[in-house]
Curated annotation (Swiss-Prot):
GO cellular component, as recorded: cell projection; cytoplasm; phagocytic cup
Gene Ontology biological-process entries: phagocytosis; positive regulation of cell motility; positive regulation of phagocytosis; protein localization; signal transduction
SUPFAM superfamilies: 14-3-3 protein
Cellular localization per UniProt: Cytoplasm; Cell projection, Phagocytic cup
Higher taxonomy: Eukaryota, Amoebozoa, Evosea, Archamoebae, Mastigamoebida
Family label: Belongs to the 14-3-3 family.
Name used for this protein in its record: 14-3-3 protein 3
Subunit organization: Interacts with coactosin. Interacts with ACTO/actophorin.
Gene3D superfamilies (UniProt xref): 14-3-3 domain
């Protein structure tokens, strides 16, 4: 028997608490497939599910890539070949999940998003997953997904700047991730710093207007923006 929407949400929470994120994804995909607007809670559950299944594999990929470089430095060709095969396996899993979430966003989530907040949330998500794609791809494929990430972040930013307060956690989270995109994917530290500084300055100016319900979330992201700015400006100073 197919689970009801309420059951899927409850099962998704159980899967989250037991750290069974692959199952959490499946339950939230069932909710998304109903093609109605997700509640804030449902939206967050879906986001957490994909973030964890992809996050663990991104971490694995970084470790394996680092080990591959170490073996290359030692000139151990046999180990390098084995590691390359293993890295390819992780990349296949990453591609599968990125394709999966991007399809859900395009087919189920964005067509049913009626508020600016939900549109920004999903376009930001789209930018994020194309960015993750760009981390492990090369050449033409990397260029293609980087362009799509840039387009999604840009559209999200336009809606966000028009309709969300500078202190809104989703607007701040978007600025944080978009600036990371410029720094890590485009290798444009100046643009990354400019974007992060603008978001930080705009939110500081309106800090007294932050509703109590989102104060903690907003200030946490503001701190992350400031941390990145500190790191990036010291990095560029070191290079000079």
């Amino acid at each position: 028997m197919a689970e009801s929407r309420e059951d899927c949400v409850f099962l998704s929470k159980l899967a989250e608490q037991s750290e069974r994120y692959d199952e959490m994804v499946q339950y939230m995909k069932q909710v998304a497939a109903l093609n109605t607007e997700l509640s804030v809670e449902e939206r967050n559950l879906l986001s957490v599910a994909y973030k964890n299944v992809i996050g663990s594999r991104r971490a694995s990929w970084r470790i394996i890539t680092s080990l591959e470089q170490k073996e290359q430095a030692k000139g151990n060709d046999k180990h390098v070949e084995i590691i390359k095969g293993y890295r390819a396996k992780i990349e296949d899993e990453l591609a599968k999940y990125c394709d999966d979430v991007l399809k859900v966003i395009k087919e189920n989530l964005l067509p049913n998003a009626s508020t600016s907040e939900s549109k920004v949330f999903y376009k930001k998500m789209e930018g994020d997953y194309y960015r993750y794609y760009a981390e492990f791809t090369v050449d033409e494929k990397r260029q293609e997904v980087a362009d799509k990430s840039l387009a999604a972040y840009t559209e999200a930013t336009e809606i966000s700047n028009a309709d969300l307060a500078p202190t809104h956690p989703i607007r701040l989270g978007l600025a944080l991730n978009f600036s990371v995109f410029y720094y890590e994917i485009m290798n444009d530290a100046d643009k990354a710093c400019q974007l992060a500084k603008q978001a930080f300055d705009d939110s500081i100016a309106k800090l007294d207007e932050v509703p109590e319900s989102s104060y903690k979330d907003s200030t946490l992201i503001m701190q992350l923006l400031r941390d990145n700015l500190t790191l990036w400006t010291s990095d560029t100073a070191d290079e000079e």
